[in-house]
Amino acid sequence: MRLALVRQRYSAYGGAERFIERALGALGEQGVAVTVIARTWIGDPGTVVRCDPFHIGNVWRDWGFARAVCREVARRPFDFVQSHERIACCDIYRAGDGVHAQWLRNRRAILGPLARVGLGLNPYHRYVLAAERRLFASPRLRAVICNSRMVRDEIRAHFGTPEAKLHVIYNGIDLEAFHPRLRKVHRPAMRQKLGIPQQAPLHLHVGVGF
């Protein structure tokens, strides 16, 4: 089987990147030929196809990448295309960034009148909304991987995607690297390093966008 994984840019801290890196190893062990299609990527160059068309600005950047990827997919004999970007030429989409339409709705709820107007006129948001609609309306789309029930419900509410296409698969965790027994090893030293009293309540938010 020949599988393409699509991600525009590599980030050392990205959840999608962790997902792809784990998939590359696991699928490779099963004899699946995996190709990463990306603008930039860190890894074995033999498994990466670079799509890096010229662009100015974020609308042109995302539109140009999506167009280049779909051209690449059309000329290569992939059995499946799994994308982490909003492109209409994929078989499986991982909705790791949630639903942009819902994010905008939540954002508008906390903004003032002028800021809401600016949000609505922003060309990038308008592009992403259009790309999102094309993705979920695509007859090629077979399945959507949702990393939470909330995302699943939002996709169903905004786009009417059939329940059978929506699959909740939570992010994997390395239970050796993240295990309660390691608390005794790292907790006191890390609190001391950050200047946090040993008994002070501490809330940690893991993710981006905070």
Predicted feature descriptions by range:
Residues H179-I196:
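A short helix/loop element that forms part of the nucleotide-sugar donor recognition site in Leloir-type
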Residues S11, I173, G207-F210:
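Glycosyltransferase donor-binding loop in the core domain
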Residues P197-F210:
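Conserved donor-binding/catalytic core segment of Leloir-type glycosyltransferases
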Residues S83-I87, A95-D97:
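Short His-centered aromatic/hydrophobic patch
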Residues L121-N147:
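Membrane-proximal helix-turn-helix segments that form the acceptor-binding/catalytic region
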Residues H55-V81, C90, H125-R134:
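An amphipathic, basic-hydrophobic alpha-helix
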Residues M150, G172:
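Carbohydrate-associated surface elements
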Residues R7-Y13, A26-W60, E72, K165:
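N-terminal strand-loop element at the rim of the active site
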